[in-house]
């Protein structure tokens, strides 16, 4: 069973006019990242409906997807996406699971109240969060409360990570790798998923391995835009296949030179060619999130 552990989806009002919505909603960083047009004239991503997502999954042989919230600058936009995700999961419980967006800058009570509402609505994790993009410190007191409660509730936390050696692009924010090792050590009961191969943290820090950071997993979101296909045989043995979660970053177009729109199947083929086995392609995230398999 293939599970895409890193998918974004947006309410219809965003998809109808992404740039206009971002301007009105106060989300300039999201606009820079998600509404940009590439030099060749292609949008960096599309804005599919939930039905279009399900059709794309069917075409690629993806059984389930984990919807990740965005690291919004405004809590009200987190709330709107969380309610939308709750509705998506209710409508398609056999195909979709979802994580909650949060903005700790909004303060103790608003954030914890939203976290409770999200859990009550069926959301099973937190993220994608980005302290460096959202404007709070990794040692922020509200963020610490969020991570502690996430551990109590067994809700994994997905964090956006940028490779310090990666290329520049509009909207890029630096995310010092040392911060993520520090978080994992400070909150050992919290399960962390570091997005985008975790900026290759285990490859640059000998102390960041599965033995020293047993609560850390890594997803592969946007991999073809960041690394060549050699990243799979290079990173899998060093990180450990049991710690890697296949994630695409759909609806980002990962192969703009070959495809006019997102192509999940091409990325799955790349992963398999690079050595991704059934655990990477779905088994690991199914166990982490306690998702039922086809055999259950």
What name fits each language-model region?
Residues 6, 57, 85, 118, ...:
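Conserved, mostly hydrophobic/aromatic
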Residues 10-13, 72-75, 105-107, 133-134, ...:
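Active-site environment of divalent metal-dependent phosphoester hydrolases
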Residues 13-19, 79, 111-112, 170-172, ...:
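Short aromatic-enriched loop/helix-cap "lid" or pocket-rim segments at secondary-structure transitions
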Residues 52-56, 81-88, 114-118, 142-146, ...:
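A general structural detector for well-ordered alpha-helical segments in enzyme core domains, enriched
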Residues 63-165, 295:
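Active-site gating/metal-coordination segments in enzymes
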């Amino acid at each position: 069973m293939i599970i895409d552990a890193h998918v974004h989806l947006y309410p219809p009002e965003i998809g109808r006019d992404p740039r206009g919505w971002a301007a009105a909603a106060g989300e300039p960083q999201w606009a820079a990242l998600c509404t940009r047009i590439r030099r060749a004239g292609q949008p960096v991503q599309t804005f599919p409906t939930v039905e279009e997502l399900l059709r794309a999954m069917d075409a690629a042989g993806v059984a389930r997807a984990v919807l990740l919230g965005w690291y919004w600058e405004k809590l009200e936009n987190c709330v709107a996406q969380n309610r939308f995700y709750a509705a998506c999961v209710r409508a398609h419980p056999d195909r979709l699971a979802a994580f909650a967006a949060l903005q700790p800058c909004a303060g103790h009570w608003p954030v914890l109240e939203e976290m409770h509402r999200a859990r009550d609505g069926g959301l099973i994790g937190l993220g994608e969060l980005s302290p460096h993009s959202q404007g709070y410190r990794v040692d922020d007191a509200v963020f610490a409360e969020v991570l502690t409660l996430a551990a109590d509730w067994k809700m994994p936390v997905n964090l956006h990570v940028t490779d310090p050696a990666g290329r520049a692009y509009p909207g890029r924010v630096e995310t010092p790798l040392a911060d993520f090792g520090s978080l994992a050590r400070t909150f050992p009961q919290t399960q962390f998923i570091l997005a985008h191969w975790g900026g290759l943290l285990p490859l640059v820090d000998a102390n960041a391995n599965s033995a020293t950071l047993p609560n850390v997993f890594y997803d592969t979101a946007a991999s073809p835009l960041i690394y060549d296909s050699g990243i799979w045989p290079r990173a899998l043995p060093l990180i450990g296949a049991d710690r890697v979660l296949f994630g695409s970053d759909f609806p980002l177009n990962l192969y703009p030179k070959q495809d006019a729109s997102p192509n999940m199947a091409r990325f799955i083929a790349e992963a398999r060619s690079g050595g991704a086995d059934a655990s990477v392609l779905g088994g690991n995230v199914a166990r982490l999130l306690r998702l039922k398999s086809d055999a259950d």
